[in-house]
Structure formats: structure tokens, C-alpha cells
Amino acid sequence: MNKLTFFFPGQGSQSVGMMAGFGGSKVIRDTFAEASDILGVDFWKMATETNESINETTNTQPIMLIAGVATWRAWQVVASDVPSILAGHSLGEYTALVVSGGLSFADSLPLVRYRAKVMQNAVPAGVGAMAAILGLDDDTVRAVCAESALNDVLEAVNFNSPGQIVIAGNKAAVERGMELAKIKGAKRALPLPVSVPSHCALMKPAALKLAEYLKDVTITTPQIPVIHNADVASYDNADKIKDALVRQLYSPVRWVETVQAVYTQGITQAAECGPGKVLAGLTKRIVAELPCVAMTSNEALLELQGVLQTN
């Protein structure tokens, strides 16, 4: 087993120009063209020209998956090293499944667009919210949520790094939670610019629809294990993988535990396979001893290749 893991980012890492570091790479362009043909949307234009549509969740989810798969394919052109374990943050879990061979690229695109649609439709505009709480431990944030929920939904939903936790639920409850978090000593409590309160109980109606859709999606045993967000475990059974994807919609993203689990399996090099450097930054805060390269350019791919050759 080699000592390499790839992490795949989710929503929030998208930006116009996010693939610029790859120049006019043929494999990148071809991957975007393939996806555009499947969904009937010009995703390359969306990724390269100034627009707001890249931030609409029904576009963001597919384009982040496309970008991650394109980066993976660009890696395959320059190197033969295959990671021994994969993980993705929220939407990134789907990208990881594609790279693992458990889900086809062609099937993944309409699947994540459908996921985005049912998430968007599960909660009327203005009803849900999310906020980042900085500087409190996990148990304190959970207690803040329990105390602030009253008759609403309010949950700790993303455990991103020690002291960086995202809460989600009904907007009024999130606002109460932010105020109480500050009283409890949070360094900051920041509302997030999202319209969908992901990974909380408000997503259960969406999860039921996703489960129905997944019945007709072919999933096979991944060739590379994928650690799932909902329970920090990997599966080789299609039904268990589908169940993990469904539960993920209304369960917390246990990212701290995920990175720790990867590290305890003997991984010595991580890479963030997709746009941005969010997961690379989180990795450093979770396990300082685990270096993580952000694969955002041709140069970064060569840097990673060089690191692997010298180790």
C-alpha cells in the first residue's frame, strides 16, 4: 500500500478561473466538454467567464465534481501513483466515488444535479441558514445548538477542524445560536452565504427523494476505499454506499475524524484534488504532520509527483 490519499472539496471552493492553473490542458477541457454534453450546460464557460450562475447550487455541485474529476485525470497523465484511500467533503464524496471507480462519471452528473435540486427545494428561501463558529470546542457548540434550538432545528453539521464548526437549521435558531456562541466565548460567529441548510434534519425530505433516485443508479465496489462523511467508514457494498450518501444529507460532515482516520492508516502524503485550498488548510490544522498539496495547477501536480518520487 502506498502512503497517498486524495481529498475532494465540496461547495464553496468554486470560483471563476478556478482551472486557470492548468493552462489549456486537453484532458481538463475534454472532461468539461464531456460533462457539458451530458447535462446540456456549458460548464467551461461558467468556469472561465465572469458570471453568477457558478454559485447556484444546481450548477455548483456538478461543476465541483467536474473540476475534481478533471484534476484527477490530469494527474493520471503525469503520474502513475494511485492513492490508497479517498475522502470528499460533502459533495466531494461523490467525486471520490467517481475516482474510486464505484460510480460512473456519466451517472454522477445528473445525480449531483438532482441532489442539488432536492436540497434547494427542501427548504423555502429564507427559512434556513448556516453559520461558522470559530474558537469553541465540539461539545460547547453542540450545547449551544441544544439550548438555542427551542422548537426549531439547529445542529452542528460540519466539524471542519478543531475550533471551526458549522451550524445549520432554521434561520432564527441559527441567529440565536450565533449570539449564544459569542456569549460562550466564540472568537467569531459568521453567517455563511448559502441558501440551503445542509447536513441537518431539514434535509430529511430531500434525503427521501435522493434515496428513491439512487435506486436506479448503478454503484459498484470501489477500487479504492472511500471514507464516507456520515460514519467515517468505507464500504464495498452498493446498498451500504447508497445508504451512506442518503444519510450524509442530514448528518454532520465529520471531517476532523476523517483526516485523523486516514492518518492512522499510515498515510504520509495528502493532496486536495480539485479547486481551492480549503481542505489543504484544514488538514494542516487537524494533523500538522500530514503534508497536503493543493492540486490547483500543472506545477502543483509536478510538485506532488516530485515529493512522491523522493519519499
Give short role names for the model-derived ranges.
Residues G23-G24, E147-A149, K182-K184, R285-A288, ...:
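Short, solvent-exposed amphipathic alpha-helical segments in soluble enzyme
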Residues Q11-S13, S100-S251:
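Alpha/beta catalytic cores of group-transfer enzymes, especially the acyltransferase/condensing modules
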Residues S90, T218, G266:
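Conserved functional loop/turn residues at catalytic and ligand-binding sites
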Residues V256-Q260:
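Short hydrophobic/charged patches on amphipathic alpha-helices used for structural packing
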Residues M1-K3, T310-N311:
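Short, low-complexity, intrinsically disordered N-terminal peptides in bacterial proteins
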Residues D231, P291-N311:
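Short, flexible loop segments at boundaries between secondary-structure elements
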Residues K182, Y263-G266:
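Non-catalytic positions within long, well-ordered alpha-helices that form the structural scaffold/packing
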Residues N2-V141, L192, Q269-E299:
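FabD-like malonyl-/acyl-CoA
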